[in-house]
């Protein structure tokens, strides 16, 4: 089975997910030549990302790393939005999430937003332009952000799902912060990884997320790239 999405930029295929007997041969983060052939065994599932979107390959069989099938061009604009700008300037994933910033499914609407309810590695490109997000904005709350140089607070009004990360809590690569607020079951821990993608295309972004260990962000990027998939 192969799934392909259309985009506008050409990029070499990148393995972004891998499971099964051949996972060591084709690990996540492995870049492939356009003319590469993948020989998969029964139980193998490989997800490839390139400038056209994602392809899912399921073994057994031999597959080309590239494909000629082209799907809806609307996906290309979604992918372009993901790689342009940072923080609040990044467009939301319109094809995947609600444009309001409040998603009824409780999932973060943009991979570059810090979900205050989840402990994770958080890859960012611009430490001075970071956005925090909460899935439940029904009540006003005060977010306490504790880090290596003390604590600061961030007030969120009722109905406010997003806010800029406070300048008082300076971010550098490797810095860790504990987030807490009234009603939280437990504090969450966020470790920031400053990434400088070698390229600004989707594969460059995905490679940076893989190297930074930012799995949840990678999952959202893959989901955005797979949102309008066609089968072929």
Where are these regions (language model features)?
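N-terminal signal peptide c-region/cleavage motif recognized by signal peptidases
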Residues: 6-8
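Flexible, surface-exposed loop/linker segments and immediately adjacent secondary-structure boundaries
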Residues: 12-31, 37, 51-129
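Short proline/glycine-enriched turn/loop motifs at strand-loop junctions of beta-rich domains
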Residues: 43, 135-141
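Edge beta-strands of extracellular beta-sandwich domains
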Residues: 52-56, 185-197
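Low-complexity, Pro/Ser/Thr- and charge-rich linker/hinge segments at domain boundaries
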Residues: 67-68, 103, 113, 194-220
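Compositionally biased low-complexity segments at domain edges in trafficked proteins
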Residues: 76-91, 203-232
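Solvent-exposed serine/threonine-rich low-complexity stretches and specific carbohydrate-binding patches
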Residues: 148-165
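Surface-exposed, short loops/turns at beta-strand junctions within beta-sandwich domains
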Residues: 166-176
């Amino acid at each position: 089975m192969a799934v392909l999405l259309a985009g506008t930029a050409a990029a070499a295929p990148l393995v972004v997910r891998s499971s099964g007997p051949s996972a060591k041969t084709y690990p996540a983060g492995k870049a492939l030549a356009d003319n590469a052939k993948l020989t998969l065994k029964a139980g193998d599932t490989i997800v490839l990302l390139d400038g056209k979107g994602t392809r899912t390959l399921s073994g057994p069989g031999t597959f080309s790393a590239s494909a000629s099938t082209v799907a809806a061009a609307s996906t290309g604009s979604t992918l372009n939005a993901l790689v342009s700008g940072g923080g609040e300037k990044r467009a939301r994933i319109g094809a995947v999430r609600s444009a309001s910033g409040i998603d009824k499914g409780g999932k973060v609407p943009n991979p570059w937003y810090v979900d205050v309810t989840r402990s994770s590695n958080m890859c960012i490109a611009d430490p001075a332009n970071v956005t925090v997000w909460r899935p439940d904005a029904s009540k006003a709350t005060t977010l306490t952000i504790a880090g290596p140089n003390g604590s600061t607070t961030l007030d969120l009004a009722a109905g406010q799902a997003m806010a800029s990360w406070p300048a008082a809590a300076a971010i550098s690569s490797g810095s860790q912060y504990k987030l807490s607020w009234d009603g939280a079951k437990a504090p969450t821990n966020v470790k920031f990884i400053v990434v400088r993608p070698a390229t600004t295309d989707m594969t460059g972004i995905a490679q940076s997320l893989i190297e930074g260990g930012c799995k949840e962000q990678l999952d959202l990027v893959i989901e955005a790239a797979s949102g309008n998939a066609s089968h072929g």
